[in-house]
């Protein structure tokens, strides 16, 4: 089997982020984490109490992260479909106004995140709409990981 043909952006855009997204699941399973997470000198595993705290904090601020992604999508769509410099003025102010609607805190007046959002505007491999494959990969990985959970996350048959 040619692994190179399945690497990086050599796959369909709606699949491109699945490998990285699904791998994160093993880090949240104790048996998966214990395969590699150990103190560099003593080889001691992460204490149960710390692991339990980590697991409880896993979704901390998840709503903020989701709203941030929705803001990126809304700004992307607005800039590519609706923005007119003669009508809407400064592009950074326009984008900031859209992003503000998706933020739980006030953005600074000089907030210029869009200027550095290379995924959409200046990515060397033409990522553009492929950026949103992260959200789709979260759906795919949640579905795919159920099989590993059911049959064992280290089961070589899966």
Task: Outline where the language-model segments fall.
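Cation-handling catalytic/transport regions enriched in His/Asp/Glu
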Residues: 1-158
């Amino acid at each position: 089997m040619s692994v190179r043909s399945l690497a990086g952006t050599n796959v369909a855009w709606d699949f491109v982020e699945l490998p990285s997204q699904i791998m994160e699941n093993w880090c949240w399973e104790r048996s998966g984490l214990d395969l590699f997470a150990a103190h560099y000198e003593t080889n001691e595993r992460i204490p149960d109490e710390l692991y339990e705290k980590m697991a409880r904090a896993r979704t901390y601020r998840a709503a903020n992260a989701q709203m941030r992604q929705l803001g990126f999508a809304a700004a992307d769509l607005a800039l590519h479909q609706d923005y007119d410099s003669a009508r809407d003025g400064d592009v950074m102010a326009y984008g900031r106004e859209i992003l503000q609607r998706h933020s739980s805190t006030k953005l600074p007046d000089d907030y210029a995140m869009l200027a550095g959002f290379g995924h959409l505007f200046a990515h060397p491999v033409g990522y553009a709409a492929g950026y949103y494959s992260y959200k789709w990969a979260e759906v795919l990985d949640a579905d795919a990981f159920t099989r590993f959970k059911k049959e064992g996350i280290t089961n070589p048959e899966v």
